[in-house]
Amino acid sequence: VASASPLSQKADRAKKLEEAGISAIVMYSLFEEQIIHESLELDHYLNRGSNSFAEAVSYLPDGGMYGISPEKYLNHVAGLKKALTIPVIGSLNGVSKGGWTDYARRIEDAGADALELNMYYIPTDINITSSDIEDMQVDLVAEVKSAIKIPLAVKISPFVTSIPTFTKRLVEAGADGLVLFNRFYQPDFDLDELEILH
């Protein structure tokens, strides 16, 4: 199985992987932060014109400039499914409940054969306990699994309190498979501003 990499970003490169004998391809992830940021950015530009009167040429932004990339991602899943005969596995990266069920369904509707839920979370809030984080992730798996019919694989971090117990909870919540482990990113600290950098 070809894991997520730049090779899945173009159909011709993915086709070469298939011709070389891979049995499935995992898409790069659609990130929660990306969806939130781009949605807020779109709202910002749609609600503010560069001129203050409606007759101005640039009163409303050019709609083509603000295409939300989740749509591009879904189109890419559909394009890979048309170009390849091997399974295409979509990937969502996020930790909060809510819109994920919609995006999971949309990735399934675009033709993905399975979905990888990549749950990488950097705890920066001292008021959130390890138990809170694990509960949040188990709830997210249950919510996403209830929204789709395709298999759900869950990619986890090695930094949980008890890997056997946590993975058992994920399977009980609906995970059909587990991916061990996520690539580790560490937050950095801005010592001048005394802020955590993500």
Residue ranges and their predicted role:
Residues 63:
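The substrate-binding groove and active-site-proximal loops of carbohydrate-active enzymes
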Residues 2-59, 68-198:
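Alpha/beta enzyme core
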